[in-house]
Amino acid sequence: PRDEAKVSVFDSGYILGDGVWEGIRLHNGKLFHIRQHLRRLYEGAKALDMEIGLEQDELQQRIEDTCAANSMQSGVHIRLMVTRGIKATPYQDPRITISPPTIVIIPEYKAPLASTLEKGIRLFTVHVRRGYPDVQDQKLNSHSKLNCITACIQAAKAGADEALMLDP
């Protein structure tokens, strides 16, 4: 249950944004493009030299079990997050991680707003740019998304629904 979910304040994802994630849809009992999502998650973890600790089939089964335990079949957005694990102390060196990876699966019912379907969304081109791949690879769904958060804030202040970020 949501009110019982807990993650350590020493988790590397919380302290440093050290983790990867995927957004997955559940529609009519099927996980949409699950193989591609898991492949990208594992490739992202590999790029960060991070072990997930489960085989892809095992992780898929955990996602399915979580949705089944919550009686969810369709119209569900799943945020799958994996962090390096718990740190001995707040410090960026991965060698001080003292636990297995933390895996979080959050399934939620998310339907588009009627106004979005009718009118679309308003975009605002923000001054915040996407980073170069050698700084923050855009192909990685990493937890550290501060530039995206800054872009959302700027778009909201401009009266837009979403930010449009340009490449460097």
Named regions from a protein language model:
Residues L166-P168:
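Short, acidic, Ser/Thr-enriched surface-loop or helix-capping motifs
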Residues P1-L164:
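Conserved alpha/beta cores of soluble small-molecule-handling proteins
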